[in-house]
Amino acid sequence: MAKKFNYKLPSMVALTLFGTAFTAHQANAAEQPQNQSNHKNVLDDQTALKQAEKAKSEVTQSTTNVSGTQTYQDPTQVQPKQDTQSTTYDASLDEMSTYNEISSNQKQQSLSTDDANQNQTNSVTKNQQEETNDLTQEDKTSTDTNQLQETQSVAKENEKDLGANANNEQQDKKMTASQPSENQAIETQTASNDNESQQKSQQVTSEQNETATPKVSNTNASGYNFDYDDEDDDSSTDHLEPISLNNVNATSKQTTSYKYKEPAQRVTTNTVKKETASNQATIDTKQFTPFSATAQPRTVYSVSSQKTSSLPKYTPKVNSSINNYIRKKNMKAPRIEEDYTSYFPKYGYRNGVGRPEGIVVHDTANDNSTIDGEIAFMKRNYTNAFVHAFVDGNRIIETAPTDYLSWGAGPYGNQRFINVEIVHTHDYDSFARSMNNYADYAATQLQYYNLKPDSAENDGRGTVWTHAAISNFLGGTDHADPHQYLRSHNYSYAELYDLIYEKYLIKTKQVAPWGTTSTKPSQPSKPSGGTNNKLTVSANRGVAQIKPTNNGLYTTVYDSKGHKTDQVQKTLSVTKTATLGNNKFYLVEDYNSGKKYGWVKQGDVVYNTAKAPVKVNQTYNVKAGSTLYTVPWGTPKQVASKVSGTGNQTFKATKQQQIDKATYLYGTVNGKSGWISKYYLTTASKPSNPTKPSTNNQLTVTNNSGVAQINAKNSGLYTTVYDTKGKTTNQIQRTLSVTKAATLGDKKFYLVGDYNTGTNYGWVKQDEVIYNTAKSPVKINQTYNVKPGVKLHTVPWGTYNQVAGTVSGKGDQTFKATKQQQIDKATYLYGTVNGKSGWISKYYLTAPSKVQALSTQSTPAPKQVKPSTQTVNQIAQVKANNSGIRASVYDKTAKSGTKYANRTFLINKQRTQGNNTYVLLQDGTSNTPLGWVNINDVTTQNIGKQTQSIGKYSVKPTNNGLYSIAWGTKNQQLLAPNTLANQAFNASKAVYVGKDLYLYGTVNNRTGWIAAKDLIQNSTDAQSTPYNYTFVINNSKSYFYMDPTKANRYSLKPYYEQTFTVIKQKNINGVKWYYGQLLDGKYVWIKSTDLVKEKIKYAYTGMTLNNAINIQSRLKYKPQVQNEPLKWSNANYSQIKNAMDTKRLANDSSLKYQFLRLDQPQYLSAQALNKLLKGKGVLENQGAAFSQAARKYGLNEIYLISHALVETGNGTSQLAKGGDVSKGKFTTKTGHKYHNVFGIGAFDNNALVDGIKYAKNAGWTSVSKAIIGGAKFIGNSYVKAGQNTLYKMRWNPANPGTHQYATDINWANVNAQVLKQFYDKIGEVGKYFEIPTYK
């Protein structure tokens, strides 16, 4: 969009740095504010994960029968008691769909049973208005209630005459009735057969006008009863037959006639019933649909009076005895159990969260395992592989939310599909059940995600895959399951797919469910009532208190009457809102336990909104006698305790939650915990009178496992914490390991050491380091892509002093990671790329893609990676305690590694076998391979290439000795240190081990390696080594030299704060010198102490941070934050503080770029800038123009480029490509072209014409002229206006609350991260920073 440039930086900056959706609201910002709601921000995707997962969790239970859907039996709907007026449980309520109740006119049928021994009286009573079901039984000889049994018989079709009734013969089958309990209906299906000696004939002679259909609670879409005990009785099915019960005292014939409105077809069925008691039955028919991701009326299957369906029967595509067995047994799928693990990672699929593209069939390949054993093993080894679900003959257990990918089918399959494992079974029936369960689960997932079944087995395209198909068509894995396992049971994937396909058609009501007869149903009548019964359900996150006068709690919102509750005047959580017609309800539950109580009418509660609780760590004062509650906004019925003591007591808060406009905190005071309103708390203040200095010198020491970087300004390292003065250290601004923390009186220390070798350096004061927590490293085996120019470090969270190397090459390079460690909230991976090894932040890594970029998210390990040998270039010291050495990585046992312990060896190969990674040790002198050792048994460093380095040195009096190998141990020492003092050393070659240089040469007639730091080079023989880096000159009072060994020198004052590009370095008498180019082109020598990696200035604001935050909080346009996707809300105090705290921001390697000075050119080369401009339309190869513009007008090159990329749509806009204006209209046909790459003068009402006019008047006849000329306008109008950093643009610390370019508190953070990404892309870093400081 073109911008109006009549104002200060408006929304241009808000859009300058890609991907931000933050609007400027201030008076001096854009005249046309942006519509925030229309922006899609990548930051919102992470917040949306919770919503996607929550939506998916609404449907987690499979139906209990083959034709059912994923009808969710949610605990939010308490089951009603079964009584003579039974209510119907509505499983759709929690699926947030609508429910339609349809009443139908039913034809009634009379069935009489010939039974000479039966003297019971059967009668039918129908209540046409209530449509309720009364089952009563009378038995004069027994007080027990008999159980109604219904016997279904298979109907035969007579096709001789479609216009007339057909006669069928049917045989009776003897049955035995059972009486398990009252008010239950057990139905028994009896097939028509010829295995009985007695045969009776029935003929349809009349049609009846009354229908008796028992009403059954807890029914699902296909009319089956829910089996809450998960018991599968194959001799009984859950269908209801339409029957009429007539009084019969003697042998008689019973006839039933069905009339359907289906053209030219009549189906007549005969049934035989045996009754054990006198019964009355009245029928209610309800219809509802399976769950769908889109809202639809629920009008599908009905619990009809007979096993009939208007849908056609499914015709199997393959002949399968097992599938026929499943159909014949009418197998039910069990409920889907959830066994999620909190520490499993959650990554979106390549199309986003909640968007899988299909499902993959796996088998566990383990004949001896169980489903519980498989899941337990997976949880222990989830870093190698984990899947979404396991299925066996009895259970379906979902182990990971299907809205997120899993690691089960290789990197390409993981990005796309749901992975489900079949656990091995061993008998025919169990195997059939497992196939039924898998097919039901697969069909449910396809239906849920609106995917149609399509086998990918033969063409690699579809929604149903085997692991073998993934291997064949996508790659990244070599597995071939589940074919071998299926064949072992005389089954095939084609049969399984056919079952999945049939299940899907049943669930989507395209074919008739199992156990039904295909026929046209009776026409439904209009709803009996005029009330709007549409149900809508939405998620809610509030709290409520039930009023003393209320209508009670409702089990379902369809209940006509609520039941009494003891939760009156208690604060309860509200999780859902439901509307049914004119009635509105809240679903309430216990705040702490989550126990569901039921639905309550909205008019019966006092309701308040509630934000999610957040963790805090704050201390307050609270008066004695104050009340603590078990819940926030608690009532007298929810008192936890009273604050004891007298006067103010210390309350330590750990949680905070906002209820409406009030804030409640949870914490502990005097050993008692609970919630209290912030109104009753005051901030703990320091004593007004100075206290006497503490004389407590008690020492406490604790173990620690963190990392730290020593600040440039420090008091040194302490040998013991009792030392009064520290020693100067060269370990500043390096990442060190922290192994212990100590407190001595009011002083606190960390014990720091080398991260890789474990060598302790000493104690450092805690306030003189930047400290981060660190988890233990874990072994991994993953492959990523990394851009050239990215730095590898010798340690995780490494600094510029710990660079191991730079990624070389063009385009994405393959990074093979073997270790992973979490530092604070960031993840670092150790691995190898192009022969170089080191640590890289996961931020710079992306998952490899096969053909196209699948996702910007890093997708970790495939299920099992094929072993491969990598070439590495490292050196290692074998630990004293090791697991031995192997001749081959395949050896199950290792030989003793004692003789290799505490020795240094070269490593040139690395291989992962199973869950272990091994390295090949090589003798450093003979280059002979020695054997493989586990990578955990060695300490490794990168080793450089040996180079010729001829020179003469003297060995320092204090040295470490001469060794047979660089970085050797005492076991490899050739000459002791005391024999080398002040001796001449003649060097012939050199090599770097990590950051340390070692020289190879001769001393005292012995030849070996010695550390360069132990040598003093003769001034006439100083040797230089290549070194490439750009420094900033930081000492205006020092000098540069044409020859560092001579006295001639020249002042650095004219070059102060300019960049100095180094090409080589050397040490002369212990002083490091750099040789490079000044900005005026001179090549000179400068001492390292006169240079800095980056120039940081601090600007004092004159106010406290709290004062600045209070000013921001009182603005008319409040600072904004997105706690939920696309929903802006006022940021709270802690959120604003977090965004404004310059100390915190400056310590973050990415966020500190909001302090980058945009008014300071960095003098980057045109070649480097062209890397950012590759493929950017007319801006491609314009690096020289941007470099010239930046230098000429004093602007940061990266900022200038990012500005142009946004305004030109990556160099593709017509305004950038150029044109002319003729007769007030834009044209490209005049032969003249004028370009505008910053949208200057391009007003919204006619942006193209106005922008070209401006360019024409300015004479911008080329893209380069437009860049240079436009930069002048940008510099003078915006950056030079005083707010020369992103932080200043957002918060304006010089005058808080005025002239701020955005209201979003994260605006500067996000833009800073984008700037950092640009620098990383070209392998550079920012050089000039200005950080405001508060009192």
From Swiss-Prot:
Keywords: Cell wall biogenesis/degradation, Hydrolase, Multifunctional enzyme, Repeat, Secreted, Signal. This is Bifunctional autolysin. Residues 864-1335 are annotated as: Endo-beta-N-acetylglucosaminidase. GO terms for cellular component: extracellular region. It catalyses: Hydrolyzes the link between N-acetylmuramoyl residues and L-amino acid residues in certain cell-wall glycopeptides; an N(4)-(oligosaccharide-(1->3)-[oligosaccharide-(1->6)]-beta-D-Man-(1->4)-beta-D-GlcNAc-(1->4)-alpha-D-GlcNAc)-L-asparaginyl-[protein] + H2O = an oligosaccharide-(1->3)-[oligosaccharide-(1->6)]-beta-D-Man-(1->4)-D-GlcNAc + N(4)-(N-acetyl-beta-D-glucosaminyl)-L-asparaginyl-[protein]. In the N-terminal section; belongs to the N-acetylmuramoyl-L-alanine amidase 2 family. Residues 515-531 have a biased composition (Low complexity). Residues 1-29 form the signal peptide. It comes from Staphylococcus epidermidis. The keyword Cell wall biogenesis/degradation applies.
